[in-house]
């Protein structure tokens, strides 16, 4: 299941969905879930057009804007697939990277009970201010959480649906998915992905939003990581009677 959280992306959602279909053409069973997070433009109508043209496209509609984490969460809840792929709705993530990340995921699946593949936008096509603020935000987060993931803000991620549903759900959780996977005893593998310039629309985050928004959540997640149950190696005693 491919989850696309979108808000006011009427000029990007059609071409992005078509690109995903091309990238996943060799897969027999997949679905695309577009979660419209209370858009005020024609995004919803564009997605409805897609659902009438493509049988594997579904719409989850937020009547009011709930935020990216809520859109992601409700998309995963609605998903029928056991493997989840997330991708941003602005078209800057390249759908052609999805099959590559899926290969990495399946190659490492048997060795790890909880596994997440996280995209790494090493050559970002953003302004210098955005790149600098993102570097600072990733540095602060990594120092506090110790997740050693270079780019948690990349929308391209792959994980099991069942693993995600075990994560605690909270506002801005999408910023901390790798840390939550590690908290669950998992492994996060970062893979370099292509990053493209935004062709249309405007960014939903200001230049320094990614630095300051979620600071309280950052310390909350740090507390959560410290409060993890110790591995007590539990087993049930069986009586001989």
Segments from the language model and where they lie:
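Short, flexible, basic/aromatic active-site loop/helix in glycosyltransferases
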Residues: 106-152, 157-158, 163-165, 219
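Structured catalytic core of nucleotide-sugar glycosyltransferases
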Residues: 1-127, 162, 166-167, 179-183, ...
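Short, hinge-like loop/turn segments at secondary-structure boundaries
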Residues: 76-78, 103, 133-137, 206-209
């Amino acid at each position: 299941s491919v989850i696309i959280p979108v808000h006011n992306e009427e000029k990007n959602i059609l071409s992005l969905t078509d690109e995903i279909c091309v990238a996943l053409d060799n897969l027999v069973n997949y679905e695309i879930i577009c979660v419209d997070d209370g858009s005020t433009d024609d995004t919803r109508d564009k997605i409805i057009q897609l659902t009438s043209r493509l049988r594997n496209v579904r719409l989850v509609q937020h009547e009011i804007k709930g935020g990216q984490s809520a859109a992601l969460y409700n998309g995963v809840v609605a998903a029928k697939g056991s493997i989840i792929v997330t991708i941003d709705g602005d078209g800057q993530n390249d759908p052609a990277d999805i099959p590559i990340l899926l290969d990495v995921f399946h190659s490492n699946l048997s060795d790890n009970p909880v596994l997440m593949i996280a995209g790494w936008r090493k050559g970002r096509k953003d302004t210098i201010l955005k790149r600098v603020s993102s570097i600072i935000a990733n540095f602060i987060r990594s120092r506090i959480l110790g997740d050693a993931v270079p780019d948690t803000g990349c929308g391209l991620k792959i994980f099991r649906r069942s693993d995600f549903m075990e994560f605690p759900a909270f506002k801005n959780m999408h910023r901390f998915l790798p840390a939550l996977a590690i908290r669950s005893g998992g492994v996060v593998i970062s893979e370099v992905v292509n990053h493209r310039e935004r062709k249309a629309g405007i960014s939903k985050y200001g230049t320094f939003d990614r630095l300051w928004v979620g600071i309280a959540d950052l310390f909350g997640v740090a507390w959560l990581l410290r409060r993890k149950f110790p591995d007590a190696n539990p087993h049930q005693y069986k009586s001989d009677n």
